[in-house]
């Protein structure tokens, strides 16, 4: 299995390399990631200037890694079209430092990168974890879950037409009771505009304020707030539950296998 890994936090993000550490146990991993942070870039594609690519020193020996002076979408497009010469079997984006829940997926660079794989008929995963301190403490939990999902895509237990958005609590897997398939919550934030003046001219800051919508019960937000792992299947009708299901035995099996993987260390 050949896996393209990208993100929107930049090529030296700890989340990306925690993910690579686990995915290299599943298949051959190639990293193509932005040369700097590109959060909230959504589906941005660079069309009006050239893209510059540099082969970089990997943080894990033996991994082929490239940095791209562009968006997360640019990275996946470049990886699939130019940098990886053999067919790619899976695109994984993350581990994002910060959750991507509800309608946040529409502006997420993490999800945008995974979308580029899905649009090219490659199964794709976006994986995120909350940031409650300067650095998430349990990146390996998210990495182990992603590795188990990748194994099930490889074996055919999960559809190879999947585009999955996964959000995990920042907890060790032994403290997470369930992985749940969820729909996306609806409106989660509202944007406001703050005005200031620098002595010469006006300037503006866009701010996002989190809402607490009433319809969050059983959604991706509800799951993570209750200490569960949320897995949502994305497609062209993002806010309708698509025909993606996992049996309870399958979700329990993924969690158990990921826990066992984490216990090996």
Curated annotation (Swiss-Prot):
In terms of superkingdom, the source organism counts as: Bacteria
**Cellular component terms, GO, for this chain's entry?**
cytoplasm
Q: Which Gene3D superfamilies match?
A: Survival protein SurE-like phosphatase/nucleotidase
Q: Which UniProt keywords apply?
A: Cytoplasm, Hydrolase, Metal-binding, Nucleotide-binding
- Give the molecular function GO annotations: 5'-nucleotidase activity; metal ion binding; nucleotide binding
Q: Which Pfam family, just one, is annotated for this protein?
A: SurE
Cofactor notes = Binds 1 divalent metal cation per subunit.
- InterPro entries, per the entry: SurE, SurE-like_Pase/nucleotidase, SurE-like_sf
Q: Does the keyword Calcium apply?
A: no
Q: Which reaction does it catalyse?
A: a ribonucleoside 5'-phosphate + H2O = a ribonucleoside + phosphate
What EC number(s) does the entry state? 3.1.3.5
Name the needed cofactors. Answer: a divalent metal cation
Q: What is the predominant subcellular site recorded for this chain? A: cytoplasm
Binding locations of a divalent metal cation: 8-9, 39, 96
* Top EC class, one word: hydrolase
Cellular localisation: Cytoplasm
Q: Does the keyword Nucleotide-binding apply?
A: yes
Q: PANTHER family, from UniProt?
A: 5'-NUCLEOTIDASE SURE, PHOSPHATASE, PUTATIVE (AFU_ORTHOLOGUE AFUA_4G01070)-RELATED
Its biological purpose is as follows: Nucleotidase that shows phosphatase activity on nucleoside 5'-monophosphates.
Q: Which family does it belong to?
A: Belongs to the SurE nucleotidase family.
- Identification of the protein by name: 5'-nucleotidase SurE
**What organism does the record attribute this protein to?**
Dehalococcoides mccartyi (strain ATCC BAA-2266 / KCTC 15142 / 195)
From the broadest rank down, the organism's phylogenetic lineage runs: Bacteria, Bacillati, Chloroflexota, Dehalococcoidia, Dehalococcoidales
């Amino acid at each position: 299995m050949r896996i393209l890994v990208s993100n929107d936090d930049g090529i030296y993000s700890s989340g990306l390399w925690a993910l690579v550490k686990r995915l290299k146990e599943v298949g051959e991993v190639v990293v193509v990631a932005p040369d700097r942070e590109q959060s909230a870039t959504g589906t941005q594609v660079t069309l009006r200037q050239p893209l510059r690519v540099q082969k970089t020193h990997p943080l894990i020996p033996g991994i082929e890694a490239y940095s791209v002076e562009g968006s997360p979408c640019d990275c996946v497009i470049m990886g699939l079209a130019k940098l990886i010469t053999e067919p790619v079997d899976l695109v994984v984006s993350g581990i994002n430092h910060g959750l991507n829940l509800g309608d946040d997926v529409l502006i997420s660079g993490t999800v945008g990168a995974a979308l580029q794989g899905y649009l090219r008929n490659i199964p794709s995963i976006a994986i995120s974890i909350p940031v409650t301190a300067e650095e998430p403490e349990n990146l390996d939990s998210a990495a182990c879950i992603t590795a188990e999902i990748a194994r099930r895509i490889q074996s055919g237990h999960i559809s190879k037409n999947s585009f999955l958005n996964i959000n995990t609590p920042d907890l060790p897997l032994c403290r997470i009771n369930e992985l749940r398939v969820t729909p996306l919550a609806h409106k989660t934030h509202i944007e406001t505009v703050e005005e200031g003046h620098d002595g010469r001219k006006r300037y503006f800051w866009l701010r996002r304020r989190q809402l607490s919508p009433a319809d969050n019960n059983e959604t991706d937000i509800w799951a993570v707030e209750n200490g569960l792992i949320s897995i949502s299947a994305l497609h062209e009708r993002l806010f309708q539950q698509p025909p993606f299901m996992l049996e309870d035995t399958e979700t329990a099996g993924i969690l158990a296998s990921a826990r066992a993987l984490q216990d090996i260390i």
